[in-house]
């Protein structure tokens, strides 16, 4: 038997139901904020992610699915969504004008890492990217979007925020941090590698011993220039004004190299201690890194599998929908197909091609979470009617075929 590859999972039945629910909820919210859909390729040149995600990241260092294709191109399956969207923004020369572009995307991402609960080698993300707006109020709006999404999905969260500074305040802080790191011994191999490539990423290490060494490290948000400090204060003010609880985490740097200024992360205890379910921030330098005109960008990405795990844990009852249409005798199937074709212009209809007893049909309708049950037998044919049952309200009656649209 051929099985799915390790760390890759089929989405069907209840998982598929929750996937659609999450995507639909996200789309409804972000469209209200003026975002439109963008779709980028799953396969990109490796250099795109090495220049955007960064050589110091675990993604580039350890986790990319990369290979040489038949055209001798060094390519990889996309490990995250932002870089591809920025590439499209630049390739279409949208960086050359001053208009604001707001896009959302969703789809598969690929990272070769150890599979575990809520972490797969092929996983799905929903994300947004906003270009051309330098205002910290855009940062706040992006965060408030996620707050609204999680509110609609009834997911409890903790919001962490930080400021990573800009080109004015970052260099001095970087010097102070390198001096501090050089004075300490015992950091893990990843931290030693990051120290030379991007020392700020050392703060993101999950090793408990490394974190203990960082207890008295200089704090980034205490070394901000006046402009970054003002923006960070405005961000906190907006969140408070909108009733959003948050915590300033001075060691929050996110896992990718391209962030600057605002960084944020949503964590949840509903699928394990402090599991990240979404995160993002501002990346004003990334457009220039990828040969675009210097500009402004901010976005977030949300891990859909982790959201599904939370929703399934809540054991939410799958909502009934659609019509189950069936017959007691096969000779009526063709007539029902004509009825189903007309109903499908406005309704979801599952038509059974099998002749079964009423109880068996009702059992099958229940398994398919149908809301309305319609059945045709000899008596119904003679009266040009159907047996009708609402499987939610438990109401049943005979209805004329000519009255179907009115009843439904």
Curated annotation (Swiss-Prot):
One Pfam family matching this protein: tRNA-synt_His
Domain of life: Bacteria
Catalytic activity: tRNA(His) + L-histidine + ATP = L-histidyl-tRNA(His) + AMP + diphosphate + H(+)
SUPFAM superfamilies in the cross-refs: Class II aaRS ABD-related, Class II aaRS and biotin synthetases
Major localization class: cytoplasm
Protein's cellular compartments: Cytoplasm
GO biological process assignments: histidyl-tRNA aminoacylation
EC assignment: 6.1.1.21
Any one annotated GO CC term: cytoplasm
Keyword ATP-binding attributed: yes
Keywords from the named record: Aminoacyl-tRNA synthetase, ATP-binding, Cytoplasm, Ligase, Nucleotide-binding, Protein biosynthesis
GO MF assignments: ATP binding; histidine-tRNA ligase activity
Keyword Nucleotide-binding: yes
InterPro entries: aa-tRNA-synth_II, aa-tRNA-synth_II/BPL/LPL, Anticodon-bd, Anticodon-bd_dom_sf, His-tRNA-ligase, HisRS-like_core, HisRS/HisZ
Subunit structure: Homodimer.
Similarity annotation: Belongs to the class-II aminoacyl-tRNA synthetase family.
Record-linked HAMAP family: His_tRNA_synth (MF_00127)
PANTHER family in alphabetical order: HISTIDINE--TRNA LIGASE, MITOCHONDRIAL-RELATED, HISTIDYL-TRNA SYNTHETASE
The protein, known as: Histidine--tRNA ligase
Organism: Campylobacter jejuni subsp. doylei (strain ATCC BAA-1458 / RM4099 / 269.97)
Gene name per UniProt: hisS
């Amino acid at each position: 038997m051929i099985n799915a590859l390790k760390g890759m999972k089929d989405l069907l039945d209840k998982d598929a139901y929750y996937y659609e629910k999450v995507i639909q909820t996200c789309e409804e919210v972000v469209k209200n904020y003026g975002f439109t859909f963008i779709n980028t390729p799953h396969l990109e040149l490796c250099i795109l992610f090495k220049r955007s995600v960064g050589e110091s990241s675990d993604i580039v260092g350890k986790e990319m699915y990369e290979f040489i294709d038949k055209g001798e191109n060094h390519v990889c399956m996309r490990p995250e969504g932002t870089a591809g969207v920025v590439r499209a923004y630049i390739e279409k020369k949208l960086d050359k004008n001053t208009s604001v572009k707001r896009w959302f995307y969703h789809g598969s991402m690929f990272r070769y890492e150890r599979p575990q609960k809520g972490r797969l080698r092929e996983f799905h993300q929903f994300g947004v990217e906003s270009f051309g707006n330098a205002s910290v109020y855009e940062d706040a709006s992006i965060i408030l979007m996620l707050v609204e999404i999680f509110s609609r999905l009834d997911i409890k969260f903790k919001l962490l925020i930080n400021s990573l500074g800009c080109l004015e305040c970052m260099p001095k802080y970087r010097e102070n941090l390198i001096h501090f790191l050089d004075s300490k011994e015992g950091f893990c191999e990843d931290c030693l590698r990051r120290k030379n490539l991007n020392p700020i990423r050392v703060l993101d290490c999950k090793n408990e011993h490394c974190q203990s060494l960082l207890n008295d490290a200089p704090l980034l948000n205490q070394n901000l220039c006046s402009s970054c400090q003002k923006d960070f204060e405005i961000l906190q003010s907006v969140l408070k004004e909108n009733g959003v609880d948050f915590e300033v985490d001075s060691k929050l740097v996110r896992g990718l190299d391209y962030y600057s200024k605002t960084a944020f992360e949503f964590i949840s205890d509903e699928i394990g201690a402090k599991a990240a379910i979404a995160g993002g921030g501002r990346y004003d330098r990334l457009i220039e890194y990828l040969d675009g005109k210097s500009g402004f960008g901010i976005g977030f990405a949300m891990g859909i599998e982790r959201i599904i795990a939370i929703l399934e844990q809540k054991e939410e009852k799958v909502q009934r929908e659609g019509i189950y249409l069936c017959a007691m005798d096969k000779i009526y199937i063709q007539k029902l197909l004509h009825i189903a074709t007309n109903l499908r212009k406005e309704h979801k209809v599952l038509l059974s091609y099998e002749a079964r007893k009423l109880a068996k049909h009702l059992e099958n309708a229940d398994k398919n979470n149908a809301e309305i049950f319609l059945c045709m037998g000899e008596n119904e044919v003679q009266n040009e009617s159907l047996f009708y049952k609402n499987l939610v309200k438990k109401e049943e009656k005979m209805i004329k075929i000519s009255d179907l649209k009115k009843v439904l």
